[in-house]
């Protein structure tokens, strides 16, 4: 069989690889003399050497070969790099293709441009060392490892002509998130979705240790990958000429396999889960770099991971670096002006076929707004506040069902969750779409479909990664999850929020659909599952992020939940967190009042207030269960103190509590004072940890009078009301808090305290005997 590459093409591709490697080394080391036109001097070298060489030559090799495939077959392909510390490689490739100069005209394709390219890398106010948002063609920074394959599959969903080449580092492959991501092939429909080509880059070492997959033997590794449902092809070697031919032939064969799988599914229907191809590329870490430094082996070892030659106080190191860089023969690669030679330029694709200029890697360029039904049509009808009970998320489920239905043709909306869609009472969506499933099916299964648009897998990492990949390539989605277990992806949220923050500063990065979380089965109604399921702290985590990114909503009822969700699905470039219960709760606002309330973010509930502008106390609340307890406390206060003047303030958008100087949603001081006064006690019943309210309001005039009750890390398997009692968020405690802080009621404090303890004692005795809450709690309802 003839070699897939002619000798001429092999020589040119090898030269292109050398050029990319040369530019990569130059970025790590040089601040001047980019073409080595004069002997290398110490002042040409950066004072601080930062970056990672070890993975870069392998990444560059793959890029060159994928370019051949793209150009030969006119492919639509993007490149995701799991080991994103190989940032110099993708920067070099986008520079060689010209897309870098298109985005950053000052980095022209010339000697001066190359010098600026080198100097800016890992330089103050330059560019980061990883495949960051500043890098054309990137949707995955790869700083925190483990998410590349999930992002790749998310990008491929509903993109039938897209191939996502995903480089999985063998160190990255040891992470839990990546381990679960291999199973994504059970959720990829070849008739409707694109293809993912996983390439396991087996260079053998991490920072200072061998990698597990490099040390288990080829047979065991093959069995492992086949067990995940892939057909691995191995490309191994350290002789570039041999590896070039092997890799080219393997890619040709794999492309044919991908096309066969897709053609069969698209022409004859999906009859079985295909075994998708993948590549295992085993090449030396730090390939083409120095073999030894100070008589210690470097190439092919962990010493090649970062900066192989670091100490230039030793004169021989300067020569070693110069010899290394000259080994790429830059004079053969670039003309006298520093531009890549034309015969090499011709190897790369052009226009949007360049992976560094593919619009899927700048998803905002492709983003189309969702077709959204009128959420007013799903409203709970209320004759009066507190007259009707409803399950808020079940109401929302009907709206999401029709969001799904309205966008079936455009195929740009999916719902994600870890086996909780039905549990979270969103099952109305199954009237329109099943759950995507390409694995085996048994007769007891329900709502499974090869064409499903509900993505359920019991891995929060995978749900988050899929959704991020889906959003980053220009689509929309929502992630529904138990509140306590969303913490599993705390760090993934961090990375996405950082990505959005940086993208907002890059003019050519177009806004993408917001990352929308619906957190339900929340802390106050996890009484049946116990302490492990009780944690409202994700909103604290989110609130730490930039104000132009983070949004947190605590709708008190179903109509507010509808209004907030519609708003979030229309938004761009945010992380929206919505916390809402799924259990039957009293409903407070009709749909028009809900819209006004959510638009304002916070407001006085006139139906529950009688302060006439001069309250004795402000009873504030945020969250559905705290709202019930606050209103129940208001009723008790009026019973105990008939002439008391109470103002009820409900907060649905937590960020309004911050000053406007801190958050764009923040109320100005006058607006805040109109709600909370400047001198009256505020008893704040809060869904989460009390410290969050203090953090948000510490600059406000009346902060010293704000007394917050919320979750204080007390819980067990108990009754719903006992949960609030355990955390001092119950109506009896809130009532006592108010009386203790109203100066004119000082004479009632002793009696009020005794009454409180009597109520708590009755509660404890009753639940201990009956296993349920007191009738006065279970049967409570609001009356004006």
Curated annotation (Swiss-Prot):
Keyword set, alphabetical order: Lyase, Thiamine pyrophosphate
Molecular-function GO term, any one: aldehyde-lyase activity
GO biological process, one term: carbohydrate metabolic process
Entry-linked SUPFAM superfamilies: Thiamin diphosphate-binding fold (THDP-binding)
Entry cofactors: thiamine diphosphate
Keyword Nucleotide-binding: no
Statement: the UniProt record of this protein carries the keyword Chaperone: no
Highest taxon above the source species: Bacteria
Top enzyme category: lyase
UniProt EC number: 4.1.2.-
CDD domains attached to this UniProt entry: TPP_PK
Family: Belongs to the XFP family.
The name this protein goes by in its record: Probable phosphoketolase
Organism of provenance: Rhodopseudomonas palustris (strain BisB18)
């Amino acid at each position: 069989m003839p070699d897939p590459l002619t000798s001429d093409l092999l020589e040119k591709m090898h030269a292109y690889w050398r050029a990319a490697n040369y530019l990569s080394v130059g970025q790590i080391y040089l601040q001047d003399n980019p073409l080595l036109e004069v002997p290398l001097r110490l002042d040409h070298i950066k004072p601080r050497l930062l970056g990672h060489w070890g993975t870069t030559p392998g990444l560059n090799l793959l890029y060159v070969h994928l370019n051949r495939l793209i150009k030969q077959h006119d492919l639509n392909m993007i490149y995701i790099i799991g080991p994103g510390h190989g940032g110099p490689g993708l920067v070099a490739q986008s520079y060689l293709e010209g897309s870098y100069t298109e985005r950053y005209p000052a980095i022209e394709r010339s000697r001066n441009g190359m010098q600026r390219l080198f100097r800016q890398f890992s330089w103050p106010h330059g560019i980061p060392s990883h495949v960051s948002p500043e890098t054309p063609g990137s949707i995955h920074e790869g700083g925190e490892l483990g998410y590349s394959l999930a992002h790749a599959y998310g990008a491929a969903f509903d993109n039938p002509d897209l191939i996502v080449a995903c480089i999985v580092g063998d160190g990255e492959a040891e992470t839990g998130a990546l381990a679960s991501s291999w199973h994504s092939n059970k959720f990829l429909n070849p008739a409707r979705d694109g293809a993912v080509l996983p390439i396991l880059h087996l260079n053998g070492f991490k920072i200072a240790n061998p990698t597990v997959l490099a040390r288990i033997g080829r047979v065991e590794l093959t069995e492992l990958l086949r067990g995940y449902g892939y057909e691995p092809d191995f490309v191994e070697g350290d002789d570039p000429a041999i590896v070039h031919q092997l890799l080219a032939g393997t890619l040709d064969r794999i492309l044919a396999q991908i096309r066969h799988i897709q053609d069969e599914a698209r022409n004859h229907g999906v009859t079985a889960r295909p075994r998708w191809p993948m590549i295992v590329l085993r090449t030396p870490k730090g390939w083409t770099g120095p073999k030894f430094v100070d008589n210690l082996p470097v190439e092919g070892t962990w010493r090649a991971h970062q900066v192989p030659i670091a100490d230039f106080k030793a004169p021989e190191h300067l020569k070693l670096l110069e010899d290394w860089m000259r080994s790429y023969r830059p004079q053969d690669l670039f003309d006298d002006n520093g531009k890549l030679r034309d015969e090499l330029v011709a190897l790369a694709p052009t226009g949007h076929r360049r992976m560094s200029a593919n619009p899927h890697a700048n998803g905002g360029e492709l983003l189309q707004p969702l077709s959204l039904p009128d959420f007013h049509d799903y409203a709970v009808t209320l004759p009066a506040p507190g007259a009707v009970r409803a399950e808020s998320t079940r109401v929302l489920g009907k709206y999401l069902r029709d969001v799904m239905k309205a966008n079936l043709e455009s195929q740009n909306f999916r719902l994600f969750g870890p086996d909780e869609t039905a549990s979270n009472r969103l099952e109305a969506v199954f009237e329109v779409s099943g759950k995507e499933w390409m694995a085996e099916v048994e007769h007891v299964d329900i709502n499974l479909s090869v064409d499903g648009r509900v993505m359920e897998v019991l891995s929060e990492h995978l749900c988050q990664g899929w959704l991020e990949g889906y959003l980053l390539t220009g689509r929309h989605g929502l992630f529904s999850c138990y509140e306590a277990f969303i913490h599993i992806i705390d760090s993934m949220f961090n990375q996405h929020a950082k990505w959005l923050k940086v993208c907002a500063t890059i003019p050519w990065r177009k806004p993408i659909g917001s990352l929308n979380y619906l957190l339900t089965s929340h802390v106050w109604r996890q009484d049946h599952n116990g302490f492990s399921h009780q944690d409202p702290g994700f909103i604290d985590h989110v609130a730490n992020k930039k104000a132009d990114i983070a949004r947190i909503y605590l709708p008190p009822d179903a109509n507010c939940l509808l209004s907030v969700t519609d708003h979030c699905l229309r938004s761009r470039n945010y992380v929206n967190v919505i916390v809402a219960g799924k259990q039957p709760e009293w409903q407070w606002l009709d749909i028009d009042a809900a819209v006004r309330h959510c638009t304002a973010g916070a407001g006085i509930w006139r139906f529950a207030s009688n302060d006439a502008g001069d309250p004795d106390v402000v009873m504030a609340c945020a969250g559905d269960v705290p709202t019930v307890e606050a209103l129940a406390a208001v009723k008790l206060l009026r019973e105990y103190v008939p002439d008391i003047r109470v103002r009820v303030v409900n907060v649905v958008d937590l960020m309004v509590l911050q000053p406007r100087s801190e958050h764009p949603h923040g109320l100005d001081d006058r607006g805040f004072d109109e709600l909370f006064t400047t001198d009256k006690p505020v008893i704040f019943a809060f869904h989460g940890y009390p410290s969050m309210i203090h953090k948000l309001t510490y600059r406000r005039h009346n902060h010293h009078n704000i007394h917050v009750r919320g979750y204080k890390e007390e819980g067990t398997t108990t009754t719903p009301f006992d949960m609030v009692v355990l955390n001092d968020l119950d109506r009896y405690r809130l009532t006592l808090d108010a009386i203790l802080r109203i100066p004119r009621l000082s004479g009632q404090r002793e009696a009020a305290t005794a009454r409180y303890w009597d109520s708590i004692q009755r509660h404890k005795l009753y639940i201990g005997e009956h296993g349920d809450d007191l009738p006065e709690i279970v049967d409570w309802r609001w009356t004006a």
